Amino acid sequence: MSMKQLNRNFPWCDEHENDSFTGILKEKCAWSDEEYFKLEDELYDLSSKYNDADQLPRIMVWRLMRVFSYVMMTIGCHFNPNDGYKIENLDDEQLFDRRERFQLVFEGFFKGEMPKTKCFEYGRSNRE
């Protein structure tokens, strides 16, 4: 299974792209729903693939953790008035909804139980 979206969002590999979700977040100070859902879809696919695995490939775990920590740190910077970084295209309530979904999807991946997307306030609900 490909890790194309994960690699696009991981700055320390050749496949990284500035027009990925994390690239846009960094370079344009904007949250791209379109790019986020590409990454999320891949997390659901990878979760299905590794559902019965006792161990996950280290390179995949490192890249997932780095993407997670970068995005959560960036959201923290947005809410820190002394930081100077602001996600320009969302108000605080929109960002809270996106942060919640992002966090629960990543936590669900590591737990091995992906959340049902119909429970989220924001975004698509195409997964039961």
Task: Identify the role of each PLM range.
Residues N9, I24, E42, R98-R101, ...:
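Charge-rich, solvent-exposed alpha-helical interaction surfaces
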Residues D45-V61:
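Short, solvent-exposed, charged loop/turn and helix-capping segments
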Residues N7-N9, R58, W62-S69:
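Short helix/strand-capping turn motifs
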